[in-house]
Amino acid sequence: MNQIEKTGELSASRFTVRDFTELVKIGIVNSNTITAFTGMWLAFQLNGISFIQNVDVIFFTIVGSALIVAASGAFNNVIDRDIDGIMERTKNRPTMTGKISGKRALMVALVLGVVGTIMLFMTTWQAGVLGVIGVFLYVVVYSLYAKRKLVSNTVIGSFSGAVPPLIGWFAVEPSFSIVPIMLFLVMFCWQPPHFYAIAIKRKEEYAAAGIPMLPVVKGIERTKKSMFFWVILLTILPFFMFELGIVYVVLATLLNIGWLALSIYGFKMEDSIKWAKWMFVYSLNYMTILFVAMVVISIFL
């Protein structure tokens, strides 16, 4: 038993709600639950399905989605214990301070994952399968392999991060249409510029931990070009979402133009760290405004 495990056993009584929320990465849980809800809401609204008469579906979808994302975060914390202590932003995670032992964190992850998956299967089998795929992609493909081995790790990790809105949609309407595809693509294209902004700010930490993030391997200027590329892709997507109405298309386009302008400004701005902070903040506001707008605008369609 290593020192972290010993400390974890001794401090088990100090396992608090805050420790739990840090273990499951509550911020990521919240943001992914919002996208899952949006997918579910749009499936109700655009297919003429009663929201009120499907309270059970709503409950199982939202809670199930939150639980599998929480499980994925906990699994990731267990896997990353060898590198979390090196990085400033992760060195105080409960699995590093000993407040939660590796064994206990693994048990929490397994329980959350199993319960969440069962709940998703109680909606439709498609939603359940998507949940399993999402966890597998994040835990096995990304956390265990791509994150540590490939410079394309962020793009690969974006597949799992784009699954929640699909889960929400398929829990209600288990068939493909342009809207769930676009929701997936929005989330997929949004993640690289968002996480590359973090990687630029934390470049030295990632380098010390041996994580081949794009800024570490290819440099900041190359990363700026990649971020610009992904934002350009985002600017195209609203024009495939006229089913949500012209108001949404205009709003999304304006948000995209703003992000595109900020991306271009990065090539002229000398302080790349400050620019990366701006990009990070913009990405958070972008996602929040965009998905809230989808929900609100769809009410009036």
Curated annotation (Swiss-Prot):
Coiled coil: none annotated. It is an enzyme of class 2 (transferase). GO terms for cellular component: plasma membrane. Pathway: Porphyrin-containing compound metabolism; heme O biosynthesis; heme O from protoheme: step 1/1. NCBIfam families: cyoE_ctaB (TIGR01473). The lineage of its organism: Bacteria, Bacillati, Bacillota, Bacilli, Bacillales. It catalyses: heme b + (2E,6E)-farnesyl diphosphate + H2O = Fe(II)-heme o + diphosphate. It is found in: Cell membrane. This is Protoheme IX farnesyltransferase. Belongs to the UbiA prenyltransferase family. Protoheme IX farnesyltransferase subfamily. Keywords: Cell membrane, Heme biosynthesis, Membrane, Transferase, Transmembrane, Transmembrane helix. Carbon 2 of the heme B porphyrin ring is defined according to the Fischer nomenclature. Converts heme B (protoheme IX) to heme O by substitution of the vinyl group on carbon 2 of heme B porphyrin ring with a hydroxyethyl farnesyl side group. The gene is ctaB. One of its GO terms (biological process) is heme O biosynthetic process. The keyword Transcription regulation does not apply. It is a multi-pass membrane protein. Interacts with CtaA. InterPro entries: Protohaem_IX_farnesylTrfase, UbiA_prenyltransferase, UbiA_prenylTrfase_CS, UbiA_sf. Its EC number is 2.5.1.141. Gene3D superfamilies: UbiA prenyltransferase. GO terms for molecular function: protoheme IX farnesyltransferase activity. Its main location: membrane. The chain crosses the membrane at residues 20-42, 55-75, 105-125, 126-146, 150-172, 176-198, 227-247, 249-269, 280-300. It holds the Pfam family UbiA.
